[in-house]
């Protein structure tokens, strides 16, 4: 049953791609060349089609991910010290007890 769903989706995507593609014109007359492709297919505004990503923002996100891993490992070390040694290791003013 899953195979039939997969085949239906593949066929639908293929047909959609064929419909949206710009047709190849073997015998082009002047009217067809003057009209060109449909505006719905081609970007008529002249802008970029993809969303730009600022480099600084991406670097900050990567840095935040690195920092969260460091913070998590620090908390894990404190918990393990408390768990095995039984000492009163404090995390932000709270004990593990």
Curated annotation (Swiss-Prot):
Q: Which Pfam families does the record cross-reference, listed alphabetically?
A: RXLR
Q: Looking at the record's lineage, which domain of life comes first?
A: Eukaryota
Q: What are the protein's UniProt keywords?
A: Secreted, Signal, Virulence
Q: Where in the cell is it found?
A: Secreted; Host cell
Q: Where is the signal peptide?
A: 1-21
What is the induction note for this entry? Expression is induced during host plant infection.
Presence of keyword Secreted: yes
Motif window: RxLR-dEER = 48-66
Report one GO cellular component: extracellular region
Q: What is its main location?
A: secreted
User: Sorted alphabetically, which InterPro entries does this protein's record hold?
Assistant: RXLR
Record family assignment: Belongs to the RxLR effector family.
Task: Give the protein's function.
Answer: Effector that is involved in host plant infection. Contributes to virulence during the early infection stage, by inhibiting plant defense responses induced by both PAMP-triggered immunity (PTI) and effector-triggered immunity (ETI).
What does UniProt say about this protein's domains?
Answer: The RxLR-dEER motif acts to carry the protein into the host cell cytoplasm through binding to cell surface phosphatidylinositol-3-phosphate.
* Record-given protein name: RxLR effector protein CRE10
Organism for this UniProt entry:
Phytophthora infestans (strain T30-4)
């Amino acid at each position: 049953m899953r195979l039939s769903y997969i085949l239906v989706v593949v066929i639908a995507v293929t047909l959609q791609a064929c419909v949206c593609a710009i047709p190849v014109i073997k015998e082009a007359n002047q009217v067809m060349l003057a009209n060109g492709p449909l505006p719905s297919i081609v970007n008529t505004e002249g802008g970029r089609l993809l969303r730009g990503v600022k480099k600084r923002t991406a670097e900050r996100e990567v840095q935040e991910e690195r920092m969260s891993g460091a913070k998590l490992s620090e908390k894990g070390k404190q918990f393990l010290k408390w768990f095995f040694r039984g000492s009163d290791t404090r995390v932000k003013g709270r004990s593990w007890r």
